[in-house]
UniProtKB/Swiss-Prot annotation:
Gene Ontology terms: biological process: hydrogen peroxide catabolic process; response to oxidative stress
One GO cellular component term: extracellular region
Location of the active site: H69
Gene: PER46
UniProt: Ca(2+) 2 binding residues: T193, D246, T249, D254
Signal sequence annotation: 1-27
Enzyme Commission code: 1.11.1.7
Descriptive protein name: Peroxidase 46
Function noted in UniProt: Removal of H(2)O(2), oxidation of toxic reductants, biosynthesis and degradation of lignin, suberization, auxin catabolism, response to environmental stresses such as wounding, pathogen attack and oxidative stress. These functions might be dependent on each isozyme/isoform in each plant tissue.
Lineage of source species: Eukaryota, Viridiplantae, Streptophyta, Embryophyta, Tracheophyta
InterPro entries: Haem_peroxidase, Haem_peroxidase_sf, Peroxidase_pln, Peroxidases_heam-ligand_BS, Secretory_peroxidase
Lineage: superkingdom: Eukaryota
Source organism per UniProt: Arabidopsis thaliana (Mouse-ear cress)
Amino acid sequence: MASSYRINCSTLLHLLMFLSSLLTSSANLSFNFYASSCSVAEFLVRNTVRSATSSDPTIPGKLLRLFFHDCFVQGCDASVLIQGNSTEKSDPGNASLGGFSVIDTAKNAIENLCPATVSCADIVALAARDAVEAAGGPVVEIPTGRRDGKESMAANVRPNIIDTDFTLDQMIDAFSSKGLSIQDLVVLSGAHTIGASHCNAFNGRFQRDSKGNFEVIDASLDNSYAETLMNKCSSSESSSLTVSNDPETSAVFDNQYYRNLETHKGLFQTDSALMEDNRTRTMVEELASDEESFFQRWSESFVKLSMVGVRVGEDGEIRRSCSSVN
C-alpha cells in the first residue's frame, strides 16, 4: 500500500476551521466523543480495518460503498446493516454491498471492552474513514456521537441511491437533497479510485448486435478501454464478474480516477458525465493535476457526508448487535 498522506500546516488550519463551522450545526457530535467512555474505540476500528485489508485488498472499496449507501438512504444511522425481509439490506439495490463482517468484527471487539457505548453508525463512518487511509489516502478526522436508527425500510433505497446511468442533473439533485454541493459530488465520486463493480452496473453502455456480440453505444468511452470491458463482460457468467473501477491503480486511493476521466476511461456513465459537462469538467481537471488538492477536498466533503441525516440523543439508540434493533 502507498503511504498515507499527511496534511501540511496551512491545509490543516483550513480544515479545522471548516470542521468547526460544521460542528456548530451539529452540537451533539464532537471529536473524540468516546474519549472518556471508550477511549480505544477508534483504535479498535482502525486496527480491524487494517487487518481485514491486509488479507483482502478489496475491503476499502467495500467499506466506502457501504457508507455511501447508508448515508444516502436514511442518513448515516447504520440502518443498512439491519437484517430482515423488508429492510434496506434486502433491497436488490444493496445486494452487492460488502464489508459487513468487518463492521461486525469491530463492533464485537468494542462491545467486549465498552458494552452498549459505541454506535454502529459511528463504526461504519470510522471504518469508511480508515478504509481510505488503509488504501493510501488522507487521514481524516471526523466527529462522532451518532446514534443508530431504529428502523430500516427497503422502500427507501431506490428513491435515494444513485444509479450508474444517472445524468449529471440527476446526480446534482440527489446530492443537493442531502445538503451536498456539486463540488462534493465531483470530489466524492473520487471514491471510484478504488473498488470494483459487476458488469451489469455499466453494460448499458453496450448493446449486442445481430450475432450476439457486444458493440459500443456510448461514444464517450475510449475505444481500447471499451474493448477491454466488452471482452471482460461478454461471457455467460458476466453477472458475477467484477471489473476494477480504476483500471490503473485499483487498490490505491489516489487521484488516478480523475486522470482516467480525462482519457475517457470512466467505468460508469455517471463518471464520464463529470468530464463531458462544463459545470464539472474544470474541477475534474484540477483534481487530476493536483493530488494534494483532491485529498484536502476529500477530507472536507467526506466529513460533510458523514453528517448527513445523523441521529443523536433520543432520536436513536446504541444497538447491541449491528444487524438488529434493540
